[in-house]
Amino acid sequence: KNDIDPKGTARPSWLNDIVNQLAHRIIINLNDSATINGINLCALAIMNVPDHTMSISQLEKCISMYLKILNVDPRRRATIPTASPMTLIRQAMELKKFRLYDVGDDMKFVRPSYGQTLQLTYFQNNIVHLFALPALLANIILRNGHILHEDVRSHARSLFYFLRHELFAPVDEKDLDNLIDKHIENFLNEGYITRDNDMLFVSGDGYQEFYILSRCIYHNLVRYLVAVTALKDTEDGKSDVPEFIEKCLSYSKRLPVEVTNNSPEFADPILFKIMCATFIRHSYFYVKEDGKLYVNEPKVQKLNRAATPLLGARDVKILNGQTLSRKVDDVLF
């Protein structure tokens, strides 16, 4: 009561932060109650493969993987569909969002019906936040090939802050390490990865499904690497937040279309503004009274070590502004 201006011309200093915190908690709670069904599970798989085309058998394997991933988190178990993967596929097909192509020899393929790609992206986005953490772990393990369990946990913690704030992923800080270990154990049990002592390796079994899982947040992670690279190249006191956002957009243009797939998110200043807020919240840089940025170099270097392997070596060089000769033939991941 004492903080309210009776004339209505001023707001208390704490109001904006409180409103933002409440809004964030409301969205987190909404995402936590997301409905899981055949159509959004099918969309999550099919929208993350080239040409959005997938065999029925591959789709069944992906949905089976998704259901097992959801079962890792006790909070998800009450909302997991009890129907079989094939039943969920049939339910999705009944909505006419997909077309089935029979090419003979019991080979059937599914792809979006004409004009349905945008709506299927919407269905995918309805549940992608529930897979943000396991998809992040899949990216870290796949892009490194082999990596210590503890390094997976460390890299995941560094990068998940950004996914959580951007996607409003309903994972509490106190539960993060435990969930990371549970997802890794699930990947081991299902044969997607193997372990030798404390070293984790990519397995040949179920590689395609594991890779498709990783793709659902891949562009998010590449954007984080763009922002980290721009921040790493930022001198203290030389630029403000709007200038840094422009720098991120400029760095995004360096990436080849094979990486960005011409996705509009790489040209969206709002997404980089959200990342700036996360950088500030977690002290990757500070904004002083003059509005200029001052970088916390040790934290930025740690984040850079986590993010750099997520992009092929050739594309990392391109992102860093290096000129490549024709002899460079790194394989694009």
Where are these regions (language model features)?
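Membrane-interfacial terminal anchoring regions of lipid-handling membrane enzymes
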Residues: 1-333
